[in-house]
Design a protein with these regions (language model features):
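Conserved pre-motif I regulatory segment
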Residues: 1-38
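Walker A/P-loop
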Residues: 31-52
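Conserved Walker A/P-loop ATP-binding site and its immediately adjacent core
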Residues: 46-81, 106-109, 169, 192-196
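Loop/turn-to-beta-strand initiation segments
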Residues: 59, 99-102, 153-156, 181-186
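Conserved helix-turn-beta segment of the N-terminal RecA-like "Helicase ATP-binding" lobe
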Residues: 67-97, 202-205
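Inter-Walker segment of RecA-like/P-loop motor cores
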Residues: 81-141
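Walker B catalytic acidic pair
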Residues: 160-161
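Post-DEXD/H (motif II) to motif III coupling segment of the RecA-like Helicase ATP-binding lobe
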Residues: 164-205
Length: 205
């Protein structure tokens, strides 16, 4: 099968040892369609996640805890992978209603789409001051996220720090994932929920 990202994306740096080990064994790790990566902040999880998605070579959806982190994903793809002569707009989107080969959204946007919400979406950090949060207006009143995902041909999903979600966002994510069949899932975290209940741990993995 043709890889959508051939001649479009290529990592411009040098892999760290742990990244190289993961990549060399990625087919084995992804045998069940799921890969969980735990690594410290600043260790290059985002870059590794992008490379894994690039190697899968199919349309994908990246979910992040906040607008700020969502944009960091898109910036990292543009700066660290996008080949000369290619424009980010050809490949990247942050809008569920206009998905591209790589679409990055927030968990709040997913929740809002599933609830057909219209209004202002603010950044996901509850600890930040209200006037410091980034926000966006959205209207999902006539939007069917499952039809949109199917139309976009999404085959892979990357979950960034999914276990830190507020409960209603997590429930929306669970419902969303249960409805999708045959998806490859890559999950990234710096802080896995080791102190969680057995039920919470099962939900995480």
């Amino acid at each position: 099968m043709k890889n959508l990202y051939d001649n479009v994306l290529q990592f411009k740096g040098k892999w760290r040892d742990y990244q190289d080990r993961v990549l060399q064994n990625s087919q084995k790790y992804l045998a069940d369609g799921k890969l969980h990566i735990v690594a410290a902040p600043g260790s290059g999880k985002t870059t590794l996640g992008i490379e894994l998605l690039r190697r899968l070579g199919e349309p994908c959806l990246i979910l992040s805890p906040s607008i700020t982190i969502r944009q960091q994903w898109l910036e990292r793809i543009t700066e660290g992978f996008l080949l000369p002569g290619r424009e980010p707009e050809e490949l990247l989107s942050n809008d569920l209603r206009h998905m591209k080969c790589i679409t990055a959204i927030t968990y709040q946007a997913l929740y809002s789409a599933m609830k057909h919400y219209q209004g202002q979406l603010s950044d996901g950090d509850d600890e930040s001051e209200e006037d410091e949060r980034e926000s966006e207006a959205d209207d999902f009143r006539d939007f069917d996220i499952f039809d949109a995902v199917k139309a976009a041909g999404i085959k892979a999903i990357c979950l960034d720090e999914a276990h830190h979600l507020r409960s209603e966002w997590w429930k929306a994510l669970e419902t969303f994932m249960k409805e999708l069949k045959g998806m490859t899932v890559i999950a990234l975290t710096a802080t896995p929920p080791y102190d969680s209940t057995p039920g919470q741990w099962k939900r995480y993995i």
